[in-house]
UniProtKB/Swiss-Prot annotation:
Superkingdom field: Bacteria
One Gene Ontology term, aspect cellular component: cytosol
Lineage: Bacteria, Pseudomonadati, Pseudomonadota, Gammaproteobacteria, Enterobacterales
Gene: engB
Residues annotated for GTP binding in this entry: 35-42, 62-66, 80-83, 147-150, 180-182
UniProt family annotation: Belongs to the TRAFAC class TrmE-Era-EngA-EngB-Septin-like GTPase superfamily. EngB GTPase family.
Database matches in SUPFAM superfamilies: P-loop containing nucleoside triphosphate hydrolases
Cofactor: Mg(2+)
A Pfam family: MMR_HSR1
Binding annotation for Mg(2+): 42, 64
Native source species: Serratia proteamaculans (strain 568)
GO process annotations (BP): division septum assembly
UniProt name for this protein: Probable GTP-binding protein EngB
Any one GO molecular-function label of the UniProt entry: GTP binding
């Protein structure tokens, strides 16, 4: 079976939900994007899809703390998880957001990959490591994007990339680390390739149905 390259430029918004219980049916394939509030997550989604306003940014913590679903095509979805790490948000709200993130990452069966975005100058903060740990515990592969890579000179960028690649080895998971920059389009091809790989992993339960109808 040949692999399909998806056209992320046609991605469109579907719905928002406060937690996993308000999401659409747990079917198809989803890849989630997670990151601290200032990691450049919205910019990465907008760059990937070539749509400036697809993932809206908010200057006010709490305004965008929903799980946002975008559809590439039927059954193929990108999921924008709530940004984490707002310093000025009350502890109770932080715990609520983290609970919603944890439930999604560990209970959503159609989740096939997690993209964690981190500022290349400040990678692997506590909550970043928690995201990775949650994913590894349930066998979900992870792509770590070190954002704002254009802020560092080439040598410093490579040094940070190598440092993070070594630092994630103890997680014992399927973790790929790449440099990324939305303005300079660094790493966009690597992101697209990884998404195509994950989205081409057809859920086993779909295969018999396709085979049965192939000869009709």
């Amino acid at each position: 079976m040949t692999s399909k390259n998806y056209n992320y430029h046609v991605t469109h918004f579907v719905t928002s939900a406060p937690d996993i219980r308000h999401l659409p049916g747990d079917e198809g394939i989803e890849v989630a994007f997670a990151g601290r509030s200032n990691a450049g997550k919205s910019s990465a989604l907008n760059t990937l899809t070539n749509q400036k306003g697809l993932a809206r940014t908010s200057k006010t913590p709490g305004r965008t703390q929903l799980i946002n679903l975008f559809e590439v095509e039927e059954g193929i979805r990108l999921v924008d998880l709530p940004g984490y790490g707002y310093a000025e948000v009350p502890e109770e709200m932080k715990r609520k957001w983290q609970r919603a993130l944890g439930e999604y990452l560990q209970m959503r069966n159609c989740l096939k990959g997690l993209v964690v975005l981190m500022d290349i100058r400040h990678p692997l903060k506590d909550l970043d490591q928690q995201m990775i740990q949650w994913a590894v515990e349930v066998g979900t592969p992870v792509l770590l994007l070190l954002t704002k890579a254009d802020k560092l000179a080439s040598g410093a960028r490579k040094a940070q990339l190598n440092m993070v690649r070594e630092a994630v080895v103890p997680f014992m998971g399927d973790i790929q680390v790449e440099a990324f920059s939305s303005p300079k389009k660094i790493g966009v091809d690597k992101l697209s390739q990884k998404l195509n790989t994950w989205f081409n992993e057809i859920p086993p339960e779909v295969l018999p149905e396709d085979d049965d109808t192939a000869g009709e």
